[in-house]
């Protein structure tokens, strides 16, 4: 006789399963998970390689730091050393803070760790203990700066004032003279910019834009695979050039010859003769999409950057690849050239900026301050400085070694393009269609613009891919995702009274990396 199996509801079966599972693991409840040493070592090795791989080779300190300091002489900090008696240690007069910045790149040797950072009371007692003449002489001795040990990309550090001792009866009442708090300069007033023309004609995203040196016309490249030349004064289409088989990502007009250069996602770099409107040269070598290009201002050299993680230097006339600039670990998004050293600057999706030696074809400096992809770099036309843009952040740097100047925060979007004019107006354009205008010197954001998309486009097609000032710097052109080119000009009716600078100085502006 077959025994019938008792049937239970699904609810009861689930709870019984939960109880069996609980009884099985109740003994291990609350205990820490045992650490696997081998997997932990591998994880740390991978993390070190991924995050610190590009900066493994740090600058070394000078050899003279390893030499023994003679007696009756000043040490490498500029501090006076006194001869030691038998059984007595050498005492140091500390007149300032430690000259070596606490950053990477300074080797900790017997000389660099010999002194400790003095407290205010300790420095004051040392100054009181010495004769007035000796203390004054030592206090006035200049402390050598630690700039030569500064890691590339680190900000300049100002040395605080040293101990100053009064003469005569006030010798015992010496004190450390506090340095005056730094004052922030007031931003220069700039008139706001307003939209006055929208030019349509492309059938796809407008990805790049350039103005010709004569300021008569400008050229755009688009995702519709065409290059269009427009009259700058009227905004009318003059010419369309076809030849690329994919999105055109970069265009530039030569100042030395009647040539137009273009690059695209079809891996091609083309040279167009504008007298015949035909392609006369191809530059072959990139293995993937070419994202940008720039011409050297003084020699016939073209530089391109690509998704294949390299930038290439081309001889314009012979079409030969002079150098392949390798070192980036991800797509190179932007490249800029200048006549002074360093002559080539690249920004990449690997979050780094590299300054290159054009002659040797090697990296001079690698800047690792950005935390996200660097999609835009712009050089100031007058100052020896440049700016770089990544999502949510713009940074300013100083040539030739890439010293960090300041952050420009507030444009919370993916920044695709940067441009600056000689008056110090920096423009940043982002993928959400917003455009911010900044004062270059102070980093003050004086205007924010978000133009409406053209009728028939989606709001999500609001994005700025490229922007440029014309040669007179009176007009600003933007290439956008709604298939249009927008032209802005300064508001002639604006004054400092109608559009005042809404600026409040901070007591101390933090320099963040």
From Swiss-Prot:
Annotated positions of the Phosphoserine modification:
119, 200, 390
Q: What is this protein called?
A: Pleiotropic regulator 1
Q: Where in the cell is it found?
A: Nucleus; Nucleus speckle
Q: What Pfam families does the record tag this protein with?
A: WD40 (PF00400)
Query: What residue ranges are annotated as transmembrane?
Result: none
Source organism superkingdom: Eukaryota
WD repeat intervals? 201-240, 243-282, 285-324, 327-366, 369-409, 410-448, 459-498
Any Gene Ontology CC annotation: DNA replication factor A complex
Example GO BP:
mRNA splicing, via spliceosome
Sequence similarity: Belongs to the WD repeat PRL1/PRL2 family.
- Quaternary organization: Identified in the spliceosome C complex. Component of the PRP19-CDC5L splicing complex composed of a core complex comprising a homotetramer of PRPF19, CDC5L, PLRG1 and BCAS2, and at least three less stably associated proteins CTNNBL1, CWC15 and HSPA8. Interacts (via its WD40 repeat domain) directly with CDC5L (via its C-terminal); the interaction is required for mRNA splicing but not for spliceosome assembly. Component of the minor spliceosome, which splices U12-type introns. Within this complex, interacts with CRIPT. Also interacts directly in the complex with BCAS2 and PRPF19.
Principal location: nucleus
Q: Which UniProt keywords apply?
A: Acetylation, mRNA processing, mRNA splicing, Nucleus, Phosphoprotein, Repeat, Spliceosome, WD repeat
Q: Which residues carry this modification: N-acetylmethionine?
A: 1
Function, as annotated, reads: Involved in pre-mRNA splicing as component of the spliceosome. Component of the PRP19-CDC5L complex that forms an integral part of the spliceosome and is required for activating pre-mRNA splicing. As a component of the minor spliceosome, involved in the splicing of U12-type introns in pre-mRNAs.
């Amino acid at each position: 006789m077959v025994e019938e199996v008792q049937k239970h509801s699904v609810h009861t079966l689930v709870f019984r399963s939960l109880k069996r599972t609980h009884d099985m693991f109740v003994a291990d409840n609350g205990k820490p998970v045992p650490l696997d040493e081998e997997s932990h070592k591998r994880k740390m090795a991978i993390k070190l390689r991924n995050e610190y791989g590009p900066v493994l080779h740090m600058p070394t300190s000078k050899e003279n730091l390893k030499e023994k300091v003679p007696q009756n002489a000043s040490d490498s900090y500029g501090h006076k050393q006194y001869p030691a008696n038998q059984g007595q240690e050498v005492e140091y007069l500390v007149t300032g803070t430690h000259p070596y910045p606490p950053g990477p790149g300074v080797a900790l040797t017997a000389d660099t760790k010999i002194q400790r950072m003095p407290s205010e009371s300790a420095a004051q007692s040392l100054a009181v203990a010495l004769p007035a003449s000796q203390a004054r002489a030592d206090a006035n001795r200049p402390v050598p700066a630690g700039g030569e040990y500064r890691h590339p990309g680190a900000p300049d550090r100002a040395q605080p004032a040293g101990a100053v001792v009064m003469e005569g009866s006030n010798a015992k009442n010496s004190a450390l003279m506090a340095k005056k708090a730094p004052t922030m300069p007031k931003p220069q007033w700039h008139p706001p910019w307003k939209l006055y023309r929208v030019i349509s004609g492309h059938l796809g995203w407008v990805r790049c834009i350039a103005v010709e040196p004569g300021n008569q016309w400008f050229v755009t490249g688009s995702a519709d695979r065409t290059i269009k030349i427009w009259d700058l004064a009227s905004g009318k289409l003059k010419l369309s050039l076809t030849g690329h088989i994919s999105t055109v990502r970069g265009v530039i007009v030569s100042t030395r010859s009647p040539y137009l250069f273009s690059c695209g996602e079809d891996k091609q770099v083309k040279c167009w003769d504008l007298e015949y409107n035909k392609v006369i040269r191809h530059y072959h070598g990139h293995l993937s999409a070419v994202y940008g290009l720039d011409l050297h201002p003084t020699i016939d050299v073209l530089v391109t950057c690509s998704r294949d993680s390299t930038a290439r230097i081309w001889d314009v006339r012979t079409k030969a690849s002079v150098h392949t600039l390798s070192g980036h670990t991800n797509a190179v998004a932007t490249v800029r050239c200048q006549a002074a050293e360093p002559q080539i600057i690249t920004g990449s999706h690997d979050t780094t900026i590299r300054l290159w030696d054009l002659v040797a074809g090697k990296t001079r400096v690698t800047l690792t301050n950005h935390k996200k992809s660097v999609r835009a770099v712009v050089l100031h036309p007058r100052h020896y400085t440049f700016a770089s843009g990544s999502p949510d952040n713009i940074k300013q740097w100083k040539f030739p070694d890439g010293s960090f100047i300041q952050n420009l925060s507030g444009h919370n979007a993916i920044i695709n393009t940067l441009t600056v004019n000689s008056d110090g107006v920096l423009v940043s354009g982002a993928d959400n269609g917003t455009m911010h205008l900044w004062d270059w010197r102070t980093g003050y954001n004086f205007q924010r613009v978000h133009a409406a998309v053209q009728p028939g486009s989606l709001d999500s097609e609001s994005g700025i891919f490229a922007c440029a000032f014309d040669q007179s710097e009176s007009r600003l052109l933007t290439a956008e995702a709604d298939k249009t080119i927008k032209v802005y000009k300064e508001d002639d009716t604006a004054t400092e009274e109608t559009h005042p600078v809404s600026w409040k100085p901070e007591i101390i502006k933090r320099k963040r990396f």
